[in-house]
């Protein structure tokens, strides 16, 4: 994982701004500790902090076209870069073996209208010195974070994380997923549009489990593009187990040369985190033994988790309760992974949104509502699980990849017949995915019920959090929450506690507005609360709150 930082539309002293840019970019260096690169002129400044994953020896950024008139800073991976290079219609002399350099070639051929050609995870700034123009883009799901802001002089800032903007900007915003900004027209434009975003486009489709299985296997294989040691996150739940099982199928050969040579690190390492005796650790051991991975159990204590909260909120840049609960164990695990020399991991985020895996989906009244909730969940995922998967790993210089959110696979998964995904009436959640991959997993894992990550690492983790905040946040403090936090006023003492820490790190009103807000049960959207009157009465967002829903489905 890398970071990018840019100052564009420069209206003040460029020399002073260059010094400031270098200082602000240091705040992002945890994302890219391997090398720093900078481009600066009177019109634009781009700084890149690199985590070397592909072409470690020659892929330093910013990247340039041969004429050095186009400058590119990217945080991401372009999984289909080789295919794109073969289809280029313009002559372009590549300078490196970096997967990201193809963006410069595509820009030469198509101008700004190339983003939908990409299959990958990315956030980038491309500066065209010939036209004094810039292009900013973010991947389809917002897997890679990106923020923008303006200072008091009107200079335009772009950064991978908000912490590099808050000290210098008066305003900050999240750059929306699936969009680009081309300075020549000054408009944010949505490049990621799919037919399946409308129920009418999929309601008569016929599901094909064989196609689903092949598409996910292809997605995992694509995402093994890597020139450094990698591993898998294995909680023992369905999603991480499926990704781990597929990864194991391809781990012995190098993906980069189409399997012609042996992998540089053929032994697959898997990682699980939890409190002593947690459900996840037991399930993960079973899967690891079945797959034959070199398995690592990371135990943490409740006190270690509590001690990490302030750092977790700083790195995650959120005060969302479920995100912080789940991110804390992942943040602790990432440190262990980094110490092992692993620089990239694959994980299972996105499956629950694609297949309706959360327990509240049992209450979906019909296929249309089920599908539309899938679409809503995917649209907001960059504020929750994508943010967690990226930033909790990037805090320690580890890159997280999420094959379920592969652009090509998503098209297959979201074009399944929605009725075939529905749970309830004797069907467990994500049954179509379980059926497709049950041959790769132990039966009890393939059919293990969904648990939220923060529950699976050990129930006492959440219980201890609640007990701690009861001591830290008095009734008097909570009663005055609306006065202290008029924007997105905390609804619980736990939310109050996290919000207070967030505001210490990011004392800017606009920063608070970047965090999602509203009532949720088991990760539902506000719309889905209408499915059951009891949902509105539940105070805790944990999946445990709707455990009875699962039982009622049988």
What kind of feature is each model-predicted range?
Residues 104-105, 241-248, 331-335, 356, ...:
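Short, hydrophobic alpha-helix immediately C-terminal to the catalytic nucleophile
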Residues 342-352, 358:
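Short acidic/histidine-rich active-site segments
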Residues 209, 273-334, 360-369, 391-392, ...:
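ATP-dependent adenylate-handling ligase core
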Residues 17, 80, 96-99, 118, ...:
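Hydrophobic (often cysteine-bearing) scaffold residues that line and stabilize catalytic clefts
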Residues 125, 321-333, 375-378, 473-479:
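Short, basic, helix/turn surface patches
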Residues 1-319:
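Cysteine-centered catalytic environments shared across enzyme families
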Residues 1, 339-346, 365, 370-554:
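Adenosyl-5′-phosphate
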């Amino acid at each position: 994982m890398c970071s990018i930082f840019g100052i564009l539309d420069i209206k003040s002293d460029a020399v002073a701004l260059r010094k400031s840019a270098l200082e602000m970019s240091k705040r992002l260096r945890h994302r890219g500790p391997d090398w720093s690169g900078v481009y600066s002129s009177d019109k634009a400044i781009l700084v890149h902090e690199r985590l070397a994953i592909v072409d470690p020896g020659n892929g330093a950024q910013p990247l340039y076209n041969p004429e050095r008139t186009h400058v590119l800073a990217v945080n991401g991976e372009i999984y289909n870069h080789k295919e794109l290079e073969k289809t280029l219609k313009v002559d372009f002399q590549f300078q490196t073996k970096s997967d990201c350099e193809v963006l410069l070639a595509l820009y030469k051929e198509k101008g700004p209208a190339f983003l939908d050609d990409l299959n990958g995870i990315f956030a980038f700034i491309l500066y065209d010195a010939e036209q004094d123009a810039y292009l900013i883009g973010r991947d389809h799901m917002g897997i890679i974070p990106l923020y923008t802001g303006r200072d008091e002089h009107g200079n335009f800032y772009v950064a991978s994380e908000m912490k590099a903007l808050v000290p210098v900007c008066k305003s900050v915003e999240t750059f929306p997923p699936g969009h680009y900004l081309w300075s020549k027209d000054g408009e944010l434009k949505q490049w990621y549009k799919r037919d399946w975003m409308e129920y009418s486009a999929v309601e008569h489709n016929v599901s094909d489990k064989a196609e689903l299985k092949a598409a996910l296997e292809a997605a995992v294989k694509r995402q093994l593009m890597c020139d450094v040691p990698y591993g898998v996150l294995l909680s023992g739940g369905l999603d991480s187990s499926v990704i781990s099982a597929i990864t194991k199928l391809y781990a012995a050969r190098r993906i980069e040369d189409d399997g012609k040579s042996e992998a540089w690190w053929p032994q697959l390492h898997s990682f699980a985190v939890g409190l002593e005796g947690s459900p996840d650790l037991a399930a993960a051991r079973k899967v690891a033994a079945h797959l034959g991975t070199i398995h690592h159990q990371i135990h943490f204590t409740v006190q270690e988790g509590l001690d990490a909260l302030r750092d977790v909120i700083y790195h995650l840049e959120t005060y969302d309760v479920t995100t912080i609960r789940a991110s804390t164990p992942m943040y602790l695990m990432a440190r262990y992974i980094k110490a092992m020399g692993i620089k990239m991991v694959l994980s299972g985020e996105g499956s629950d949104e694609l297949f309706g895996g959360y327990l509240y989906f049992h209450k979906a009244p019909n296929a249309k509502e089920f599908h539309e909730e899938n679409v809503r969940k995917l649209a907001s995922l960059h504020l929750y699980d994508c943010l967690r998967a990226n930033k909790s790993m990037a805090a320690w210089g580890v890159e997280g990849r999420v094959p379920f959110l592969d652009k090509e696979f998503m098209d297959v998964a979201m074009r399944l017949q929605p009725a075939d995904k529905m749970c309830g009436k004797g069907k467990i959640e994500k049954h179509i995915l379980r059926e497709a991959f049950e041959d790769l997993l132990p039966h009890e894992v393939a059919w293990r019920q969904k648990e939220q990550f923060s529950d699976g690492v050990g129930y006492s983790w959440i219980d201890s959090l609640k007990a701690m905040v009861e001591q830290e946040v008095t009734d008097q403090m909570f009663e005055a929450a609306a006065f202290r936090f008029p924007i997105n006023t905390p609804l619980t003492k736990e939310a109050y506690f996290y919000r207070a820490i967030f505001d210490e790190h990011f004392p800017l009103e606009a920063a608070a507005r970047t965090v999602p807000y509203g009532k949720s049960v088991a990760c539902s959207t506000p719309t889905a609360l209408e499915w059951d009157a009891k949902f509105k009465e539940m105070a805790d967002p944990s999946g445990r709150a709707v455990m009875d829903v699962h039982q009622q489905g049988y």
